[in-house]
Regions:
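Conserved alpha/beta-domain cores
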Residues: 2-361
Length: 361
């Protein structure tokens, strides 16, 4: 935790800055670290990280190989208590601050084994044949998973996953409220490229959330928003902003989609680009202002033209980088979100950006 003179100094920085600094955290432990460092909420919780625990992954795999909706729902019911507990941990640590929960994003094949012995063990545990499981794994493989069956596309194909996650968020919030915790759940739908994708899922989430609140006789303000990580979403932000309560620019994927190369593969040629002065900076570390930044500017202007009060922020790696934070400040975004240990850096960078902006007026 930050203490003593440094705490006083950081409080001066907070008095100056305009941007809120939130954190990317997937569990209560990381959330506590971030709060100790001065984070004012969670800007990104990646729910898929919660599924990789040994007991949970088995039930999630059971859901993946299920043939019917009822079988999938039965498997998801076993995961629901874990998800609920995880969300309760986050709400407790962030008492009074927003917690942005991104629904399932990665393609399903990432949750299945690829080694022969692991496939055989899983087939035995699931009570299916090895050939059946192999066929299932093969059917989920993709040529380009980054642009494949993931994010909101997964949720639209399997709405029962969205229903389970919505229940987990709502029930966790209700239980925390009974303990006197001030809860601010923000549900985030990933990889939206068309407003109709967002509307389809919002029309599942909102009625279910509202019915659970009514059932428990609880009143709670929650938000439903999306990540802007596909160029088309940025270019049609006015359409999406009519439906969404907030946008979070997922600058990692937005950079990949805009440049047309993946972060995982770019290392094969980026060093050559630096040597030959084609690129001066890593676009995955420092936001590309001229390209990706221009899309963010367009999206911000379009969104605010139809929804002036929409909450806008970024939650990629760039959320903890100084020049990227200055860009967000100058554009008038509401917040940046970064990893817990970068929170103090982001707070200082946000203060510096605000001071520089005032000096230039």
């Amino acid at each position: 935790a930050i203490g003593g003179d440094f705490k006083t100094f950081m409080s001066w920085a907070d008095d100056v800055k305009k941007l809120e600094v939130r954190t990317n955290a997937d569990n209560g432990r990381d959330a506590r670290v971030a709060r100790d460092f001065g984070a004012c909420g969670i800007g990104l919780c990646r729910t898929e990280h919660m599924f990789f625990d040994e007991e949970r992954i088995f039930n999630f795999r059971k859901m993946i190989v299920a043939d019917t909706v009822s079988e999938r729902e039965a498997a998801l019911e076993l995961i629901l208590p874990y998800q609920k507990q995880d969300f309760m941990d986050l709400f407790r640590e962030m008492d009074g601050y927003p917690v942005t929960i991104r629904f399932l994003d990665p393609p399903l094949h990432e949750f299945l084994p690829n080694k022969e012995d692991e496939i055989a063990t899983l087939a035995n545990d699931l009570g299916v044949s090895i050939s059946f499981l192999k066929n299932k794994i093969d059917s989920l493989k993709e040529f380009n998973p980054m642009m494949g069956h993931r994010g909101c596309r997964l949720s639209i194909t399997y709405p029962e996953i969205v229903a389970m996650q919505t229940k987990a968020v709502c029930l966790a919030a209700i239980e925390c409220m009974k303990d006197g915790i001030s809860v601010k759940p923000h549900i985030m739908i990933p990889l939206v490229g068309d407003v109709n994708e967002f509307k389809y899922l919002k029309d599942i989430i909102a009625p279910l959330f509202d019915s659970l609140l009514l059932e428990h006789n609880v009143s709670l303000d929650y938000k439903i928003g999306t990540m802007i990580e596909i160029p088309r979403a940025a270019l049609t932000a006015d359409e999406i902003a009519k439906e969404a309560d907030f946008f979070s620019f997922g600058t990692n994927d937005l950079t990949q989609m805009t440049y047309g190369f993946s972060r995982d593969d770019a290392s094969k040629f980026l060093n050559c680009y630096y040597d030959k002065k084609i690129f001066l900076n890593d676009p995955f570390v420092r936001l590309d202002i001229n390209g990706v930044g221009e899309l963010i500017k367009i999206a911000t202007a379009k969104a605010r033209s139809v929804n002036p009060k929409i909450d806008l922020g970024i939650c990629g790696e760039h959320g903890g980088e100084e020049t990227s934070i200055k860009f967000c400040n100058d554009l008038g975004l509401n917040y940046v979100s970064c990893s817990p240990y970068r929170v103090p850096i982001a707070r200082l960078a946000a203060a510096k950006a605000a001071i520089m902006e005032n000096d230039n007026k």
